[in-house]
Regions:
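Short coil turns that delineate tetratricopeptide repeat
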Residues: 1, 31-33, 65-67
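Non-heme Fe(II)/2-oxoglutarate
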Residues: 88-180, 200
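Catalytic core of non-heme Fe(II) oxygenases with the double-stranded beta-helix
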Residues: 156-159, 163-261, 266-290
Length: 290
C-alpha cells in the first residue's frame, strides 16, 4: 500500500491523473485519516477536474487536523472551482491580507543597515532545490535565532506587528483560521530571500505555519521589459501544474520597509522581473501559543 501511495503521487505529478487515482483508491484502506495521503489525493482530484472529490478529501483532512494548511488550501481551490461562496469566507483576501510599514525601518540608516547584514548571510550560489524560489538565494537556518542586534530589533518589531494583526482578527470559533487566535505566537521559521535577474517564487503554501509573511526591503526599479506587476506578491493563484487556469485573487505591490501578513494556507508566489536588479525580503511563519 505504501508503494501504491508513492507511485500515485509520482504519476499524478507526471500528469497521469487517472492512473494515480486508481492507485490512491487501492491504497486508501491502509491510509484512512492520513493527512498527507488525503492532501495528495485531493491535489490529484483537482488536477483531474473532480472538485467535489477534492472538497470531500480536504474536509476529511481538515477534520483530522484543523491546523492542516494543505487541507485548507485545497479546500479553497475546490470551492473556487465549484463557485461556492464559502471560498470567500475561508480566504478573505481583503481582511486577512494586510500590508503595513515597519516604523523602525523608516529611521535614518535603519533599512540600509539591515540590508547590509542580510547580504552578508546570502552565501549560496543558487536557490535551494526543495524551496519555492527560482533564480535567487535563501539564508540557512532560522534567521531570528541569530544574535546580531539588528536582527534582534527586527524580530521585536515584527512580533509587535503580528500581535497587532492578531488583535484585529474577529472572534470566530467556527473559522479554521480565526479560531486559532491565541495570547502569543512562536516563529516556526524565519529566513531571507535575495532574488536577482528573473527570480521569482512559484505558487506554494506553508504547511508548518498559521500566519505567513513577506517583508520587502529592496524593491527593483521599474524596467521597460518587466511583465505586469513585476516583483509583486500574488495571492490566490493556484500552482500552474494543477492546470486550473485561475487568476490571482489579490496582487500586492511591494513597498520597501512594509510587511505583508496573510494566512499560511493561502496560495502565494511572486511575479518575475526582467532586469538584473536585486529584490531582498525577509519572511517567517508564525504559529499560535498559549
Amino acid at each position: 500500500a505504501e508503494i501504491d501511495f508513492y507511485e500515485a503521487v509520482a504519476r499524478g505529478e507526471l500528469g497521469e491523473g487517472d492512473a494515480a487515482e486508481a492507485l490512491f483508491a487501492r491504497a486508501a484502506p491502509q491510509f484512512s485519516g492520513h493527512g498527507p495521503f488525503l492532501g495528495a489525493r485531493a491535489r490529484n482530484a483537482l488536477r483531474r477536474g473532480e472538485p467535489r472529490q477534492a472538497e470531500a478529501l480536504a474536509q476529511e483532512a481538515g477534520a483530522r487536523d484543523p491546523a492542516d494548511q494543505f487541507a485548507l488550501a485545497y479546500l479553497s481551490l475546490a470551492w473556487r472551482v465549484l463557485g461556492d461562496p464559502r471560498e470567500a469566507w475561508l480566504h478573505d483576501y481583503d481582511a486577512q491580507v494586510q500590508q503595513r510599514p515597519i516604523a523602525w525601518l523608516a529611521e535614518p540608516g535603519a533599512l540600509e543597515e539591515l540590508c547590509s547584514v542580510l547580504r552578508g548571510l546570502h552565501r549560496a550560489a543558487s536557490h535551494p532545490p526543495d524551496q519555492s524560489l527560482r533564480g535567487g538565494t535563501q539564508t540557512e537556518g532560522a534567521l531570528f535565532r541569530r544574535s546580531h542586534p539588528v536582527l534582534r530589533r527586527l524580530r521585536a518589531a515584527i512580533l509587535a506587528e503580528v500581535a497587532a494583526h492578531i488583535a484585529r482578527m474577529p472572534d470566530d470559533p467556527d473559522h479554521p483560521h480565526y479560531r486559532r487566535r491565541a495570547a502569543g505566537v512562536r516563529l516556526a521559521g524565519s529566513w531571507s530571500v535575495r532574488l536577482t535577474g528573473a527570480g521569482f517564487h512559484i505558487a506554494h503554501i506553508h504547511q508548518a505555519g498559521w500566519i505567513s509573511s513577506a517583508l520587502h526591503l529592496v524593491v527593483p526599479p521599474p524596467d521597460p521589459a518587466d511583465p505586469p506587476h513585476a516583483g509583486s506578491l500574488v495571492l490566490g493563484e493556484p500552482p500552474a501544474e494543477l492546470g486550473l487556469g485561475l487568476p490571482p485573487r489579490r496582487i500586492v505591490a511591494p513597498i520597501a520597509g512594509a510587511l505583508v501578513l496573510f494566512p499560511s494556507s493561502m496560495w502565494h508566489g511572486t511575479v518575475a522581473f526582467a532586469g538584473g536588479h536585486e529584490r531582498l525580503t525577509v519572511a517567517f511563519d508564525a504559529v499560535p501559543v498559549g
